[in-house]
Amino acid sequence: PPRSTLFPYTTLFRSHIERCLACGRCQSKKNQRPCVHEQTDDVAAIFRRMKESDLIIYATPVYVFAMSGLLKTFLERLYAKGVVSELTVSKKGLIFHKIAAAICSKPFVTLVCCDNLERETPQNVIDYFDTFSKFTDAPQVGLLVRNGGQLSGGGKDPMREEKVPKIYDVYEAYRQAGRELAQAGRIERATQQRANREIVPLPFFSLIKRLHFRPLKKKFVEKAREMMVTR
Protein backbone atom coordinates (compact mmCIF):
# COMPACT_ATOMS: atom_id res chain seq x y z
CA PRO A 1 0.00 0.00 0.00
CA PRO A 2 1.14 3.59 -0.57
CA ARG A 3 3.04 5.12 2.32
CA SER A 4 4.24 8.58 3.21
CA THR A 5 7.69 9.13 1.75
CA LEU A 6 10.20 11.86 2.50
CA PHE A 7 12.58 13.08 -0.18
CA PRO A 8 15.23 15.27 1.45
CA TYR A 9 17.53 16.79 -1.12
CA THR A 10 20.89 18.51 -1.15
CA THR A 11 21.67 21.32 -3.57
CA LEU A 12 25.41 21.19 -4.05
CA PHE A 13 25.89 24.81 -5.05
CA ARG A 14 24.40 25.82 -1.70
CA SER A 15 26.79 23.50 0.14
CA HIS A 16 30.43 24.01 1.06
CA ILE A 17 32.36 21.28 -0.75
CA GLU A 18 36.14 21.29 -0.85
CA ARG A 19 37.97 19.33 -3.54
CA CYS A 20 40.05 16.25 -2.80
CA LEU A 21 43.72 17.29 -2.50
CA ALA A 22 45.11 13.80 -3.15
CA CYS A 23 47.17 14.38 -0.01
CA GLY A 24 46.92 10.73 1.04
CA ARG A 25 46.16 11.46 4.68
CA CYS A 26 42.98 9.36 4.58
CA GLN A 27 44.93 6.40 3.18
CA SER A 28 47.92 6.47 5.55
CA LYS A 29 49.20 2.92 6.08
CA LYS A 30 50.05 3.59 9.72
CA ASN A 31 46.72 5.05 10.69
CA GLN A 32 43.85 5.78 8.31
CA ARG A 33 42.74 9.23 9.34
CA PRO A 34 39.70 11.36 8.47
CA CYS A 35 39.78 13.58 5.42
CA VAL A 36 41.54 16.90 6.03
CA HIS A 37 38.23 18.62 5.21
CA GLU A 38 36.19 16.50 7.65
CA GLN A 39 35.52 19.38 10.04
CA THR A 40 35.61 22.27 7.59
CA ASP A 41 32.95 21.61 4.94
CA ASP A 42 29.55 19.95 4.45
CA VAL A 43 30.57 16.64 2.87
CA ALA A 44 30.56 14.59 6.09
CA ALA A 45 27.00 15.72 6.83
CA ILE A 46 25.89 14.84 3.29
CA PHE A 47 27.47 11.40 3.60
CA ARG A 48 25.53 10.86 6.84
CA ARG A 49 22.26 11.69 5.09
CA MET A 50 23.14 9.31 2.26
CA LYS A 51 23.87 6.56 4.78
CA GLU A 52 20.44 7.04 6.36
CA SER A 53 18.60 7.00 3.01
CA ASP A 54 16.86 4.08 1.32
CA LEU A 55 18.00 5.20 -2.11
CA ILE A 56 19.78 8.12 -3.75
CA ILE A 57 18.97 10.21 -6.82
CA TYR A 58 22.05 11.63 -8.51
CA ALA A 59 20.71 14.58 -10.51
CA THR A 60 22.84 16.71 -12.79
CA PRO A 61 22.68 18.87 -15.89
CA VAL A 62 25.10 18.11 -18.69
CA TYR A 63 27.93 20.64 -18.69
CA VAL A 64 30.37 20.33 -21.62
CA PHE A 65 29.39 16.67 -22.20
CA ALA A 66 29.82 15.61 -18.56
CA MET A 67 28.19 15.89 -15.15
CA SER A 68 28.48 19.19 -13.31
CA GLY A 69 31.89 19.91 -11.81
CA LEU A 70 30.27 20.21 -8.38
CA LEU A 71 28.85 16.70 -8.49
CA LYS A 72 32.14 15.26 -9.71
CA THR A 73 34.04 17.11 -6.96
CA PHE A 74 31.63 15.71 -4.40
CA LEU A 75 31.89 12.13 -5.68
CA GLU A 76 35.68 12.32 -5.62
CA ARG A 77 35.46 12.78 -1.86
CA LEU A 78 34.25 9.17 -1.59
CA TYR A 79 37.94 8.29 -1.86
CA ALA A 80 38.40 9.12 1.82
CA LYS A 81 35.72 6.60 2.79
CA GLY A 82 37.45 3.66 1.13
CA VAL A 83 40.61 1.71 1.91
CA VAL A 84 42.63 1.51 -1.29
CA SER A 85 45.14 -0.95 0.16
CA GLU A 86 42.42 -3.60 0.68
CA LEU A 87 41.46 -5.14 -2.66
CA THR A 88 38.07 -6.72 -3.28
CA VAL A 89 36.07 -8.09 -6.21
CA SER A 90 32.66 -6.60 -7.00
CA LYS A 91 29.56 -8.67 -7.75
CA LYS A 92 30.20 -7.94 -11.43
CA GLY A 93 33.65 -9.51 -11.10
CA LEU A 94 35.62 -6.25 -11.16
CA ILE A 95 38.72 -5.76 -9.02
CA PHE A 96 38.33 -2.73 -6.77
CA HIS A 97 39.21 -1.63 -3.27
CA LYS A 98 37.25 -1.65 -0.03
CA ILE A 99 34.50 0.95 -0.09
CA ALA A 100 32.04 2.42 2.37
CA ALA A 101 29.16 0.21 1.24
CA ALA A 102 26.65 1.97 3.50
CA ILE A 103 27.14 5.04 1.31
CA CYS A 104 28.44 3.84 -2.05
CA SER A 105 26.29 0.74 -2.51
CA LYS A 106 22.89 2.37 -2.03
CA PRO A 107 20.33 1.82 -4.80
CA PHE A 108 20.29 4.93 -6.96
CA VAL A 109 18.60 6.71 -9.84
CA THR A 110 20.50 8.71 -12.44
CA LEU A 111 18.63 11.87 -13.45
CA VAL A 112 20.21 13.85 -16.30
CA CYS A 113 18.94 16.91 -18.12
CA CYS A 114 20.30 18.81 -21.10
CA ASP A 115 19.10 21.20 -23.77
CA ASN A 116 20.69 19.42 -26.72
CA LEU A 117 18.72 16.75 -28.59
CA GLU A 118 21.57 14.49 -29.68
CA ARG A 119 21.89 11.14 -27.88
CA GLU A 120 25.67 11.58 -27.56
CA THR A 121 25.25 14.65 -25.34
CA PRO A 122 24.44 12.87 -22.02
CA GLN A 123 26.30 9.65 -22.85
CA ASN A 124 29.36 10.35 -20.68
CA VAL A 125 27.13 10.82 -17.63
CA ILE A 126 25.16 7.66 -18.39
CA ASP A 127 28.37 5.67 -18.83
CA TYR A 128 29.86 7.08 -15.62
CA PHE A 129 27.00 5.91 -13.42
CA ASP A 130 26.81 2.56 -15.20
CA THR A 131 30.48 2.04 -14.31
CA PHE A 132 29.88 3.37 -10.78
CA SER A 133 27.17 0.75 -10.31
CA LYS A 134 29.39 -2.10 -11.49
CA PHE A 135 32.30 -1.26 -9.21
CA THR A 136 30.32 -0.33 -6.08
CA ASP A 137 27.56 -2.98 -6.22
CA ALA A 138 25.02 -0.16 -6.14
CA PRO A 139 21.84 -1.16 -8.04
CA GLN A 140 20.80 1.48 -10.56
CA VAL A 141 17.02 1.39 -10.15
CA GLY A 142 16.21 4.06 -12.70
CA LEU A 143 17.70 6.11 -15.53
CA LEU A 144 15.90 9.33 -16.45
CA VAL A 145 17.38 11.39 -19.27
CA ARG A 146 15.51 14.51 -20.31
CA ASN A 147 16.88 16.22 -23.38
CA GLY A 148 15.38 19.20 -25.17
CA GLY A 149 15.27 21.25 -21.99
CA GLN A 150 14.58 24.51 -23.79
CA LEU A 151 11.66 22.86 -25.54
CA SER A 152 10.08 21.18 -22.51
CA GLY A 153 10.70 24.07 -20.12
CA GLY A 154 11.47 24.01 -16.42
CA GLY A 155 8.08 22.95 -15.08
CA LYS A 156 4.38 22.90 -15.85
CA ASP A 157 3.63 25.28 -18.70
CA PRO A 158 0.14 25.14 -20.28
CA MET A 159 1.32 27.07 -23.35
CA ARG A 160 4.05 24.55 -24.09
CA GLU A 161 1.76 21.60 -23.41
CA GLU A 162 -0.84 22.99 -25.80
CA LYS A 163 1.83 23.48 -28.46
CA VAL A 164 3.44 20.06 -27.88
CA PRO A 165 1.08 17.57 -26.13
CA LYS A 166 3.93 15.09 -25.62
CA ILE A 167 5.31 17.35 -22.90
CA TYR A 168 2.28 16.68 -20.70
CA ASP A 169 2.79 12.93 -21.00
CA VAL A 170 6.48 13.29 -20.13
CA TYR A 171 5.67 15.16 -16.91
CA GLU A 172 3.05 12.55 -16.06
CA ALA A 173 5.73 9.88 -16.51
CA TYR A 174 8.02 11.68 -14.07
CA ARG A 175 5.24 11.80 -11.49
CA GLN A 176 4.65 8.09 -12.04
CA ALA A 177 8.38 7.46 -11.60
CA GLY A 178 8.21 9.16 -8.21
CA ARG A 179 5.28 7.01 -7.15
CA GLU A 180 7.08 3.84 -8.23
CA LEU A 181 10.22 4.79 -6.33
CA ALA A 182 8.19 5.45 -3.19
CA GLN A 183 6.18 2.25 -3.42
CA ALA A 184 8.51 -0.26 -5.08
CA GLY A 185 11.98 1.25 -4.82
CA ARG A 186 12.57 1.21 -8.58
CA ILE A 187 11.22 2.74 -11.79
CA GLU A 188 9.52 0.44 -14.27
CA ARG A 189 11.14 0.24 -17.70
CA ALA A 190 7.94 1.40 -19.41
CA THR A 191 7.82 4.49 -17.20
CA GLN A 192 11.45 5.29 -17.98
CA GLN A 193 10.72 5.02 -21.69
CA ARG A 194 7.79 7.43 -21.37
CA ALA A 195 9.86 9.89 -19.36
CA ASN A 196 12.82 9.68 -21.73
CA ARG A 197 10.83 9.87 -24.96
CA GLU A 198 11.58 12.46 -27.61
CA ILE A 199 9.28 15.47 -27.52
CA VAL A 200 9.99 16.83 -31.00
CA PRO A 201 6.72 16.13 -32.88
CA LEU A 202 8.27 14.45 -35.91
CA PRO A 203 7.66 10.80 -36.90
CA PHE A 204 10.56 8.47 -36.04
CA PHE A 205 12.62 11.39 -34.72
CA SER A 206 14.63 9.27 -32.27
CA LEU A 207 15.62 6.92 -35.08
CA ILE A 208 16.21 9.42 -37.86
CA LYS A 209 18.29 11.81 -35.73
CA ARG A 210 21.00 9.15 -35.53
CA LEU A 211 21.68 9.77 -39.20
CA HIS A 212 24.35 12.45 -39.40
CA PHE A 213 22.87 14.07 -42.50
CA ARG A 214 23.17 17.85 -42.23
CA PRO A 215 20.21 18.90 -44.43
CA LEU A 216 17.92 16.64 -42.41
CA LYS A 217 19.31 17.97 -39.12
CA LYS A 218 18.65 21.51 -40.31
CA LYS A 219 14.99 20.57 -40.79
CA PHE A 220 14.91 19.31 -37.21
CA VAL A 221 16.37 22.59 -36.00
CA GLU A 222 13.64 24.51 -37.83
CA LYS A 223 10.97 22.34 -36.19
CA ALA A 224 12.55 22.82 -32.77
CA ARG A 225 12.50 26.59 -33.22
CA GLU A 226 8.78 26.43 -33.95
CA MET A 227 8.24 24.61 -30.64
CA MET A 228 9.99 27.19 -28.51
CA VAL A 229 7.81 29.65 -26.63
CA THR A 230 9.18 33.17 -26.57
CA ARG A 231 9.69 34.25 -22.96
Show which residues each predicted segment covers.
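Short, flexible, glycine/charge-rich loop motifs used to bind or transfer phosphoryl groups or to couple energy/partner
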Residues: 1-3, 45-47, 97-99, 192-193, ...
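Helix-loop-strand module that forms the ligand-binding subsite of alpha/beta enzymes
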Residues: 12, 36-135, 218, 222
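Structured loop/turn residues at beta-strand edges in well-structured enzyme cores
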Residues: 5, 18-21, 51, 103, ...
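N-terminal beta-loop-helix "entrance" segment that forms/cooperates
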Residues: 13-33, 151-158
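Residues at the starts of beta-strands that form the adenosine-phosphate
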Residues: 8, 107, 139-141
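Positions that flank functional sites
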Residues: 15, 65, 148
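Glycine-rich phosphate/pyrophosphate-binding loop and the adjoining helix
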Residues: 119-120, 126, 130-230
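Short, small-residue-biased leader/transition segments that mark boundaries at the very start
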Residues: 1-12
